[in-house]
Amino acid sequence: MSLFRFFSKPASAPQARERLQVLLAHERASHEHSDLVAVLREEILAVIAKHIQIDRDKVSVKMDRGDQMSTLEVDIELPLKTKAKVRAA
Protein backbone atom coordinates (compact mmCIF):
# COMPACT_ATOMS: atom_id res chain seq x y z
CA MET A 1 0.00 0.00 0.00
CA SER A 2 1.54 3.26 -1.06
CA LEU A 3 1.30 6.55 0.75
CA PHE A 4 -0.78 8.03 -2.10
CA ARG A 5 -3.44 5.32 -1.82
CA PHE A 6 -3.71 5.89 1.90
CA PHE A 7 -5.05 9.44 1.40
CA SER A 8 -7.17 8.76 -1.69
CA LYS A 9 -10.90 8.09 -1.72
CA PRO A 10 -11.99 4.46 -1.93
CA ALA A 11 -13.16 3.32 -5.34
CA SER A 12 -16.88 3.76 -5.89
CA ALA A 13 -17.11 1.12 -8.62
CA PRO A 14 -17.98 -1.78 -6.26
CA GLN A 15 -20.74 0.26 -4.63
CA ALA A 16 -22.10 1.34 -8.01
CA ARG A 17 -22.02 -2.26 -9.24
CA GLU A 18 -23.94 -3.45 -6.17
CA ARG A 19 -26.57 -0.73 -6.58
CA LEU A 20 -26.98 -1.61 -10.25
CA GLN A 21 -27.43 -5.29 -9.40
CA VAL A 22 -30.14 -4.44 -6.87
CA LEU A 23 -31.86 -2.20 -9.40
CA LEU A 24 -31.71 -4.87 -12.12
CA ALA A 25 -33.02 -7.54 -9.76
CA HIS A 26 -35.94 -5.30 -8.84
CA GLU A 27 -36.71 -4.55 -12.50
CA ARG A 28 -36.58 -8.24 -13.43
CA ALA A 29 -38.83 -9.12 -10.52
CA SER A 30 -41.46 -6.59 -11.56
CA HIS A 31 -41.49 -7.85 -15.17
CA GLU A 32 -41.52 -11.54 -14.26
CA HIS A 33 -44.08 -11.19 -11.47
CA SER A 34 -46.88 -13.09 -13.21
CA ASP A 35 -44.53 -15.81 -14.47
CA LEU A 36 -43.10 -16.35 -11.02
CA VAL A 37 -46.53 -16.69 -9.43
CA ALA A 38 -47.60 -19.23 -12.08
CA VAL A 39 -44.44 -21.29 -11.57
CA LEU A 40 -44.80 -21.19 -7.79
CA ARG A 41 -48.46 -22.23 -8.04
CA GLU A 42 -47.62 -25.26 -10.16
CA GLU A 43 -44.75 -26.32 -7.90
CA ILE A 44 -46.88 -25.95 -4.77
CA LEU A 45 -49.66 -27.99 -6.38
CA ALA A 46 -47.20 -30.72 -7.35
CA VAL A 47 -45.86 -31.00 -3.80
CA ILE A 48 -49.33 -31.13 -2.23
CA ALA A 49 -50.57 -33.63 -4.83
CA LYS A 50 -47.91 -36.07 -3.62
CA HIS A 51 -49.72 -36.33 -0.29
CA ILE A 52 -53.43 -35.56 -0.77
CA GLN A 53 -55.91 -35.04 -3.56
CA ILE A 54 -57.05 -31.45 -3.98
CA ASP A 55 -59.08 -29.53 -6.52
CA ARG A 56 -56.62 -27.43 -8.54
CA ASP A 57 -59.24 -24.70 -8.93
CA LYS A 58 -59.42 -24.26 -5.15
CA VAL A 59 -55.81 -23.05 -4.87
CA SER A 60 -55.01 -19.35 -4.95
CA VAL A 61 -51.48 -17.91 -5.04
CA LYS A 62 -50.98 -14.17 -4.79
CA MET A 63 -47.81 -12.09 -4.50
CA ASP A 64 -47.81 -8.55 -3.13
CA ARG A 65 -44.70 -6.45 -3.58
CA GLY A 66 -43.96 -3.65 -1.16
CA ASP A 67 -41.10 -1.22 -0.79
CA GLN A 68 -39.29 -3.18 1.89
CA MET A 69 -40.89 -6.63 1.72
CA SER A 70 -42.76 -8.93 -0.63
CA THR A 71 -45.50 -11.27 0.56
CA LEU A 72 -46.55 -14.58 -0.95
CA GLU A 73 -50.09 -15.59 0.01
CA VAL A 74 -51.25 -19.16 -0.65
CA ASP A 75 -54.88 -20.18 -0.01
CA ILE A 76 -55.70 -23.87 -0.34
CA GLU A 77 -59.16 -25.22 0.27
CA LEU A 78 -58.73 -28.74 1.60
CA PRO A 79 -61.57 -31.28 1.46
CA LEU A 80 -63.03 -32.44 4.78
CA LYS A 81 -62.17 -36.06 4.11
CA THR A 82 -58.87 -36.36 2.35
CA LYS A 83 -57.63 -39.46 0.65
CA ALA A 84 -54.00 -39.80 1.56
CA LYS A 85 -51.79 -41.22 -1.12
CA VAL A 86 -49.77 -44.23 -0.08
CA ARG A 87 -46.17 -44.27 -1.21
CA ALA A 88 -44.94 -47.40 -2.91
CA ALA A 89 -41.92 -48.86 -1.15
UniProtKB/Swiss-Prot annotation:
Keyword annotations from UniProtKB, A to Z: Cell cycle, Cell division
Gene3D superfamilies given in the database record: Cell division topological specificity factor MinE
Keyword hit for Translocase: no
GO biological process, one term: regulation of division septum assembly
Pfam family, one: MinE
Role summary: Prevents the cell division inhibition by proteins MinC and MinD at internal division sites while permitting inhibition at polar sites. This ensures cell division at the proper site by restricting the formation of a division septum at the midpoint of the long axis of the cell.
Protein family membership: Belongs to the MinE family.
HAMAP family: MinE (MF_00262)
Name of the protein described by the UniProt record: Cell division topological specificity factor
Organism of this sequence: Brucella anthropi (strain ATCC 49188 / DSM 6882 / CCUG 24695 / JCM 21032 / LMG 3331 / NBRC 15819 / NCTC 12168 / Alc 37)
